[in-house]
A protein has these predicted regions:
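A hydrolase-biased, glycine/serine/histidine/acidic-enriched motif that marks catalytic-domain neighborhoods
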Residues: 1-178
């Protein structure tokens, strides 16, 4: 999957510096693309990860066997209601079902994904409210990035891409990019 996105990126911008930023599966893709760009000798000026963890650190078999955590199911219901309310009658439940299907596809893709070593610096924004117990970002990402800068966010995974979260994330990114 990274190779497909890498080809698309290179068709638009054959040479760096590259600025990559991704959330969840998108972060996994951004990290994999960054690694491949560096292997080609290209400059990756920024790699931002929004609550992204190496797929190797997730126990997918356990998650599949146990089904979704009740807290996760409650969060999905909350998100569905918030989404439908925000659409003010412009979207249907079918649209949210399609979004849920995309989420299920992302989880399926992550079960077979493998991280590649990126020798540069990554900036990770961690959603502290849903961080798995014992997940130390420096330890977990150590084998996969050359350097890691971590910024904790007081939110859940699904909320790290909300306007409220970006009120805190935006200034950090602006400062880094100078």
């Amino acid at each position: 999957m990274c190779e497909h996105h890498l080809r698309t990126l290179l068709a638009q911008q054959p040479h760096g510096p590259y600025y990559l930023f991704g959330y969840s599966l998108g972060g996994t893709l951004a990290q994999g693309i960054a690694a491949r760009l560096r292997q080609r000798g290209e400059a990756v000026a920024f790699l931002g990860l929004l609550d992204t963890w190496p797929p190797e650190t997730q126990n997918w078999a356990e998650k599949e066997a146990n089904g979704l955590d009740p807290e996760v199911l409650a969060e999905i219901d909350r998100e569905r209601e918030a989404f439908l309310a925000a659409q003010q009658g412009q979207a249907s439940g079918e649209l949210f079902s399609a979004i849920e299907g995309n989420y299920a596809d992302a989880v399926r893709l992550l079960t077979t994904a493998h991280s590649a070593k990126f020798d540069g610096k990554a900036t990770l924004f961690v959603a502290e409210k849903t961080r798995q117990e014992g997940m130390d970002p420096q330890v977990v990402w150590g084998p996969w990035v050359g350097e890691l800068e971590v910024f904790s966010q007081n939110c859940a995974h699904v909320d790290i891409i909300s306007p409220q979260a970006f009120e805190a994330i935006g200034p950090v990114v602006r400062e880094i990019l100078g």
